[in-house]
Structure formats: structure tokens, C-alpha cells
């Protein structure tokens, strides 16, 4: 799904793409491994996209998206597009951009991830990746049921679910 969003930005001729990500913890000491950042970096390297000074991580929240975007703006050199690892991060980033009179998508394109309801109500409406939360819940419930029923042992697994890019109005093709 990350690759789909980045391919979309590449098709729109973006050669400088930023990343605003988050960290989640399983408990106070164990960091949950989210591969979105790794996929982002690998895609950029393979496609000769500049990303290095535009890579920031905080939390998966509006506030963190806002703070990371302010930090990026204060660096002075903005990318032409930003991939946000969640819609709340993107919504916070959008607010920071608007407060600094940086127009989306005219000055910078913005893509979120999750397709939360609020993403279609932002100005402009946010282009995002739809991740099927209901399907994730079904898989999770099935796994827990099988473990409790002793049909399977509790082993780590990674499940890839189909995601869809929802194209709205926060991205623009550049020359």
C-alpha cells in the first residue's frame, strides 16, 4: 500500500518526497515494528527520489503531525510531496502548512494512510490509502479464536491485506 501511494506521487513527477511517520509501543519498552518507513526508503532509493532531509518520526497523532510539519518547514527546504504514515499525522501536517500559508496541493502534495472519515472533510479533501480495518478485525478475531480453541499455536504472523489509494484533492502533478 505504501508503494502504491509512492508510485502515484512518482507518476505525478514528484522527485523530492518527505515522510512523516509514527512509533507505536506494544508496552512501555517494546517498540512495534512498522515497515512503512523501510518500504518508503527502499522505494525512494530504487526510484532516485530525494528523501533524506525529509524523514521525520513522532507519534500517530494530529499533534505529532503538526509538530513534525512545523519542524520540516523550519528546515527551510520543503519536498514537493509528503507521505504520512497515518491520516491523523496528515491532518496535523495540513494544519501546519495552512497556518504557514503553504497551499495544498498547489505548493506541496500530501498523502495520508487509513482513510479515516475525517480525511474526506479536510480542506482540501485528503488523498489517502484505504486500509480495511474491518477485515483486520476479522483476521484478528479469527486468530484469537483459533489460539483459544487450540487449533493453532500462538506464533507471530504477518498478514497482507488489500489496500486502495483514494484519490481526492491533496495531490497535484508537477512539471
Model-derived regions: residue spans:
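Bacterial carbohydrate/catabolite-sensing allosteric modules
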Residues: 1-175
Amino acid at each position: 500500500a505504501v508503494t502504491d501511494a509512492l508510485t502515484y506521487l512518482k507518476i505525478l513527477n514528484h522527485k523530492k518526497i518527505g515522510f512523516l511517520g509514527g512509533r507505536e509501543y506494544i508496552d512501555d519498552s517494546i517498540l512495534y515494528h512498522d515497515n512503512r518507513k523501510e518500504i518508503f526508503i527502499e522505494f525512494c532509493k530504487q526510484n532516485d527520489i530525494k528523501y533524506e532531509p525529509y524523514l521525520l518520526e513522532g507519534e500517530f497523532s494530529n499533534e505529532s503531525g503538526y509538530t513534525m510539519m512545523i519542524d520540516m518547514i523550519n528546515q527551510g527546504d520543503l519536498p514537493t510531496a509528503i507521505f504520512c504514515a497515518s491520516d491523523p499525522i496528515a491532518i496535523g501536517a495540513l494544519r501546519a502548512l495552512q497556518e504557514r500559508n503553504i497551499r495544498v496541493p498547489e505548493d506541496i502534495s500530501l498523502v495520508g494512510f487509513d482513510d479515516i472519515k475525517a480525511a474526506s472533510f479536510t480542506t482540501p479533501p485528503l488523498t489517502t490509502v484505504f486500509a480495511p480495518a474491518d477485515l483486520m478485525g476479522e483476521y484478528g478475531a479469527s486468530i484469537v479464536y483459533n489460539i483459544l480453541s487450540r487449533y493453532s499455536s500462538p506464533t507471530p504472523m504477518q498478514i497482507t491485506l488489500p489496500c486502495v489509494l483514494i484519490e481526492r484533492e491533496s495531490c497535484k502533478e508537477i512539471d
